[in-house]
Swiss-Prot record:
PROSITE patterns: RNA_POL_L_13KD. Part of the RNA polymerase complex. It is found in: Cytoplasm. This is DNA-directed RNA polymerase subunit Rpo11. Its EC number is 2.7.7.6. GO terms for molecular function: DNA binding; DNA-directed RNA polymerase activity; protein dimerization activity. InterPro entries: RBP11-like, RBP11-like_dimer, RNA_pol_Rpb11_13-16kDa_CS, Rpo11-like. It comes from the Archaea. Belongs to the archaeal Rpo11/eukaryotic RPB11/RPC19 RNA polymerase subunit family. GO terms for biological process: DNA-templated transcription. CDD domains: RNAP_L (cd06927). The gene is rpo11. The keyword Transcription applies.
Length: 92
Protein backbone atom coordinates (compact mmCIF):
# COMPACT_ATOMS: atom_id res chain seq x y z
CA UNK A 1 0.00 0.00 0.00
CA UNK A 2 1.15 3.49 -0.80
CA UNK A 3 -0.61 6.43 0.80
CA UNK A 4 -0.57 9.97 -0.55
CA UNK A 5 -2.15 12.91 1.29
CA UNK A 6 -3.73 15.02 -1.44
CA UNK A 7 -5.26 17.72 0.76
CA UNK A 8 -5.40 18.49 4.47
CA UNK A 9 -7.00 21.29 6.44
CA UNK A 10 -7.89 21.61 10.12
CA UNK A 11 -11.02 19.52 9.62
CA UNK A 12 -10.72 17.84 6.21
CA UNK A 13 -8.49 15.17 4.75
CA UNK A 14 -8.23 13.72 1.25
CA UNK A 15 -6.03 10.64 0.95
CA UNK A 16 -5.18 8.44 -2.02
CA UNK A 17 -4.59 4.79 -1.09
CA UNK A 18 -2.72 3.26 -4.00
CA UNK A 19 -3.31 -0.39 -4.64
CA UNK A 20 -6.26 -0.71 -2.26
CA UNK A 21 -9.77 -1.87 -3.08
CA UNK A 22 -13.29 -1.53 -1.77
CA UNK A 23 -12.51 -3.99 1.03
CA UNK A 24 -10.35 -1.66 3.11
CA UNK A 25 -12.08 1.55 2.04
CA UNK A 26 -15.55 0.29 2.99
CA UNK A 27 -14.28 -0.78 6.40
CA UNK A 28 -12.63 2.60 7.01
CA UNK A 29 -15.68 4.53 5.83
CA UNK A 30 -18.09 2.48 7.91
CA UNK A 31 -16.08 3.01 11.09
CA UNK A 32 -15.41 6.68 10.37
CA UNK A 33 -19.08 7.56 9.96
CA UNK A 34 -19.82 5.99 13.36
CA UNK A 35 -17.39 8.43 15.00
CA UNK A 36 -19.27 11.41 16.47
CA UNK A 37 -16.42 13.74 15.47
CA UNK A 38 -16.83 12.85 11.79
CA UNK A 39 -19.30 14.93 9.79
CA UNK A 40 -18.67 13.13 6.49
CA UNK A 41 -16.64 10.15 5.31
CA UNK A 42 -16.71 8.58 1.88
CA UNK A 43 -14.42 7.36 -0.84
CA UNK A 44 -14.33 7.55 -4.59
CA UNK A 45 -12.94 4.96 -6.95
CA UNK A 46 -13.51 5.66 -10.61
CA UNK A 47 -12.69 2.12 -11.74
CA UNK A 48 -11.23 -0.64 -9.60
CA UNK A 49 -8.68 -1.78 -12.18
CA UNK A 50 -7.46 1.60 -13.43
CA UNK A 51 -7.77 4.08 -10.56
CA UNK A 52 -6.79 4.27 -6.92
CA UNK A 53 -9.38 5.09 -4.27
CA UNK A 54 -9.49 8.48 -2.61
CA UNK A 55 -10.80 8.69 0.96
CA UNK A 56 -12.44 11.93 2.11
CA UNK A 57 -12.95 12.82 5.78
CA UNK A 58 -14.56 15.93 7.25
CA UNK A 59 -14.59 16.37 11.02
CA UNK A 60 -16.10 18.75 13.55
CA UNK A 61 -12.70 20.41 13.89
CA UNK A 62 -10.85 17.42 15.30
CA UNK A 63 -7.61 16.70 13.44
CA UNK A 64 -8.70 14.28 10.68
CA UNK A 65 -5.31 12.55 10.72
CA UNK A 66 -5.81 11.75 14.41
CA UNK A 67 -9.31 10.41 13.66
CA UNK A 68 -7.97 8.22 10.84
CA UNK A 69 -5.15 6.87 13.04
CA UNK A 70 -7.63 6.02 15.79
CA UNK A 71 -9.89 4.32 13.26
CA UNK A 72 -6.97 2.22 12.02
CA UNK A 73 -6.24 1.24 15.64
CA UNK A 74 -9.86 0.07 16.03
CA UNK A 75 -9.49 -2.12 12.93
CA UNK A 76 -6.29 -3.63 14.32
CA UNK A 77 -7.99 -4.35 17.65
CA UNK A 78 -10.92 -6.01 15.88
CA UNK A 79 -8.55 -8.18 13.84
CA UNK A 80 -6.64 -9.15 17.00
CA UNK A 81 -9.91 -10.10 18.68
CA UNK A 82 -10.93 -12.18 15.66
CA UNK A 83 -7.60 -14.04 15.69
CA UNK A 84 -8.10 -14.80 19.39
CA UNK A 85 -11.67 -16.04 19.02
CA UNK A 86 -10.90 -18.01 15.87
CA UNK A 87 -7.84 -19.67 17.43
CA UNK A 88 -9.91 -20.79 20.42
CA UNK A 89 -12.67 -22.13 18.18
CA UNK A 90 -10.21 -23.91 15.89
CA UNK A 91 -8.52 -25.62 18.83
CA UNK A 92 -11.77 -26.69 20.50
Amino acid sequence: MELNILNKTNNELEVELRGETHTLLNLLKDLLIKDERVEAAFYDMKHVSISDPILYIKTDGTDPILVLKETAAIIIAQCDEFIDVFSKAANA
